[in-house]
């Protein structure tokens, strides 16, 4: 850059700083790059698939999927993990369906959880914005976008047409709160439902509610699906769950994680640790027996996971080893995910032979 351009740029930067304050325009090289802080989801496999060890703070996240796929369970798991780190969390329950007893079983400290059950969509989003601007909240969950009913629709008659009202409401609210979320370093999670587009001949007919604004503003979008049942004998005790990272602005997207959600207990973390520890050589598997550092810890995955539950020090050590190996730059976690699924299938077959 020649001297005249340098002087012109310096004058422009000086004027901008006087008018808008110091730091309005910065050179990216002036400050060291910092890793994006993350909050664990409670699922080790999903934390690895997200690439940074969890959901990013200071960003908007959308979690969507069919009914009973585990959307609320996943967000309550995030809240439980955040509270363990001393974070303050809020739950905007637009669906009026939050069960405090179930949340407590998942590890949520319900006494400290802030809960709002707003009457209208405008009220829900205004409360969310005020909580963000307080700079005192670390995690806010809005359950769900589909239940954010505009005031005009509530006050109108049942058969009235209100085309695009909810989409305009979401677009306006997201424009308003996005900057505040970044400044407050607050994680805001929107739960969303799936609808079907009529007359789609090619491609997926599925879409999410509330228009397109949330798709653009969200830094991470997670598609959660129930893929099967977890059984003990003939009794169904949980769900096999697959989460696909369909959008990710903080790490490579399109990775996926598979884990189990046990009814009344939440995400089966110890089972994930056993699978990943075997995959990466921290735990040895011979037939149906699992061994750690030369000593047997259990026959079958369920018994090995129970051993980890009874020995939290070993469980934490294994989890740390896995995170240190897979959450370092240069690790191809997409390839890891496909290998993990293949190994999990092999182990399931071996356990079934017990």
UniProtKB/Swiss-Prot annotation:
Question: What PROSITE patterns does the record tag this protein with?
Answer: RECA_1 (PS00321), RECA_2 (PS50162), RECA_3 (PS50163)
Q: Which GO terms describe its cellular component?
A: cytosol
The yes or no answer to whether the keyword Cell cycle is present is no
Record keywords, A-Z:
ATP-binding, Cytoplasm, DNA damage, DNA recombination, DNA repair, DNA-binding, Nucleotide-binding, SOS response
Top-level taxonomic group: Bacteria
Q: Which CDD domains match?
A: RecA
What SMART domains does UniProt report for this protein, alphabetically? AAA
Which GO-annotated molecular functions does the record name? Answer: ATP binding; ATP hydrolysis activity; ATP-dependent DNA damage sensor activity; damaged DNA binding; single-stranded DNA binding
GO terms, biological process: DNA recombination; DNA repair; SOS response
What InterPro entries would the database entry show?
AAA+_ATPase (IPR003593), DNA_recomb/repair_RecA (IPR013765), DNA_recomb/repair_RecA_CS (IPR020584), P-loop_NTPase (IPR027417), RecA-like_C (IPR049261), RecA-like_N (IPR049428), RecA_ATP-bd (IPR020588), RecA_C_sf (IPR023400)
The record lists ATP as bound by 65-72
Localization, UniProt: Cytoplasm
Q: Which family does it belong to?
A: Belongs to the RecA family.
Instruction: Please give the function described in this protein's UniProt entry.
Output: Can catalyze the hydrolysis of ATP in the presence of single-stranded DNA, the ATP-dependent uptake of single-stranded DNA by duplex DNA, and the ATP-dependent hybridization of homologous single-stranded DNAs. It interacts with LexA causing its activation and leading to its autocatalytic cleavage.
- Annotated PANTHER family: MITOCHONDRIAL DNA REPAIR PROTEIN RECA HOMOLOG-RELATED (PTHR45900:SF1), RECA (PTHR45900)
* Name of this chain's protein: Protein RecA
What organism, scientifically named, is this protein from? Pseudomonas savastanoi pv. phaseolicola (strain 1448A / Race 6)
Provide the taxonomic classification. Bacteria, Pseudomonadati, Pseudomonadota, Gammaproteobacteria, Pseudomonadales
Q: Which gene encodes it?
A: recA
